[in-house]
Regions:
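Conserved HGGG/HGGXW glycine-rich cap/lid loop of the alpha/beta-hydrolase fold
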Residues: 6-58
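Active-site loop/oxyanion-hole signature of alpha/beta-hydrolase fold enzymes
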Residues: 40, 49-85, 251
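Gly/Ala-rich beta-loop-alpha elbow adjacent to hydrolase catalytic centers
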Residues: 86, 90, 94
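Flexible "cap/lid" loop of the alpha/beta hydrolase fold
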Residues: 99, 106-137
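Conserved alpha/beta-hydrolase catalytic His-Asp/Glu region
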Residues: 119-120, 140-195
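Short beta-strand/loop motif that positions the catalytic acidic residue
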Residues: 199, 205-207, 211
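Conserved alpha/beta-hydrolase "acid-adjacent" motif
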Residues: 212-218
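Catalytic active-site module of serine/aspartate enzymes centered on a nucleophile-bearing elbow/loop
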Residues: 229-284
């Protein structure tokens, strides 16, 4: 459903499930479809809000402009405070939101992301070339190259059909070239290295041990910089850790966001097992 923010700006979004609100902020090149492993699990416990990151009109103020759109969306939905999960570029937006509008952020989950700037370890030139699809001659080849670099070998070997489905989704529902480049430029300029320590929301950092786009050293530095933050580093996963190790990610997130007493009262079979293939069946 599109939300009219200004005369020229709208945001496509979905709200699913009931419970405390949980805002999911996707990364570069992904739309709401990228949460196909999370929605079945999270909607059991949370009013889960997903939306498509924009950028067509330019991001003069970088990630701050994307954060402004998030605030407008929450205002439209009447959400006064929400848990927030951001992946990659979405993690940048989540950090900006937690710093600039701490009144809106309850608990914070940052996955496959960093605090920007130089950081402890930069993306290698080869990984950057793969992400941008350099050396390819079609949109499909570029998407495949980027997604291969974003996932670990174990995942691609065990779930080749699912990987191919993600490639198809990426091609069918990806940002415009202008939006993609604006988002990429905003991410390149992002730097909260001197401010991230002021985040006050309880924070969980999740990362894949084989992430080529955001090397794991960045996750360790991020968790160390945010007071009291917890770190979960998952093996056999790359940048798309929330897809590759979805069961573990979902379990960690639900456990972190839900009070212990509430978890005991509403204990149910593992949500994560039901997420396997559910969205693939409905979309395939």
């Amino acid at each position: 459903m599109p939300v009219l923010i200004t005369e020229n700006t709208s945001i496509d979004h979905d709200v699913q499930g009931e419970g405390p609100p949980l805002l999911l902020i996707n990364g570069l090149g992904f739309g709401r479809w990228g949460w196909f492993k999370q929605i079945p699990a999270f909607a059991r416990h949370f009013e889960t809000i997903t939306f498509d990151i924009r950028g067509e009109l330019g991001l003069r103020n970088g990630v701050a402009d994307l954060t402004g759109e998030v605030v407008a969306l929450l205002d439209h939905l009447g959400v006064g405070k929400t848990h927030v999960l951001g992946t990659s570029l979405g993690g940048f937006v989540a950090q900006e939101l937690a710093l600039g509008r701490p009144d809106l952020v309850d608990r914070l989950v940052l996955a496959c992301t960093s605090y920007g700037g130089r950081g402890p370890e930069a993306m290698s030139p080869g990984a950057l070339a793969d992400m941008m699809g350099l050396g390819t001659f079609s949109a499909e080849a570029a998407a495949r190259k980027a997604l291969e670099a974003a996932t670990g070998e174990v995942y691609r070997a065990e779930k080749p059909e699912e990987f191919e489905q993600i490639v198809r989704w990426r091609l069918a529902d990806s940002p415009s070239v202008v939006s993609y480049l604006e988002q990429a430029k905003a991410g390149a300029r992002f730097d909260l290295s001197g401010d991230v320590g002021h985040i006050t929301s309880p924070t969980l950092v999740i990362h894949g041990a084989e992430d080529r786009y955001v090397p794991p050293a960045n996750a360790r530095a991020l968790a160390e910089a945010i007071p009291g933050a917890k770190l979960r580093l998952l093996e056999d996963a790359g940048h798309l850790v929330f897809v590759e190790r979805f069961a573990d990610v979902n379990r960690e997130v639900v456990t972190f966001l839900r009070p212990r007493k509430l978890r005991k009262r509403t204990a149910r079979p593992a949500d994560e097992a039901e997420a396997e293939g559910a969205q693939l069946r409905s979309r395939g």
